[in-house]
Amino acid sequence: MKLLIKTYGIATILLLSFTLQTAAQTKRSTKRTKVVVRKNTKTVSKRVPRTKVTYKKQQRKVIAVRNIPNRKVVSHKGRNYYYSNNKFYTYSSGRYIAISPKLGFRISVLPRNYRTIRFNNRNYYNASGVFYIKTNNVYEVVDPEVGTIVYELPDNYEKVIIDGQVYYEFANVLYEKVQVDGTRAYEVVSIIEMD
């Protein structure tokens, strides 16, 4: 008799635990909302002339090396660029200078450190601050849309001041520091126009 009560008791407890667990999972809300908190109150237009941008450091840091291991040559608009260790380089005066690839630059394989960013029903691939989209089985360098949010800036970003407000610039893209659901993030606010 005790064995029968234990068997039915354990079976009932297991049945209730599975039922309650399932009910608890179905009541959970699946909607995700993002709360974005901005510090700056001024808005920047989609394109900012280079003359309005003041860099905190007057000299841009140039990274140049004498040789790069396992480099791949990539041609774009008649110029050779070199790719190694998830960075792009150009060759000048016997040295390889680290650069950001130009708009329209196409590669067949994304760098290993890329992150997928979904914005306005489009997938962007961000690798070291450079945005790519997939077109015809290749990845093309593009400007991101204003409002795109990233959670970390690339290593070589620069602080800039526009109309008294501090922004962050990399590859002519301006970012503003924001809070997304309590986490620090950076929102694309503008693109710097080249002269």
Regions found by a protein language model. Give the residues of each.
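Classical secretory targeting signals
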Residues: 1-34
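Low-complexity segments
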Residues: 28-195
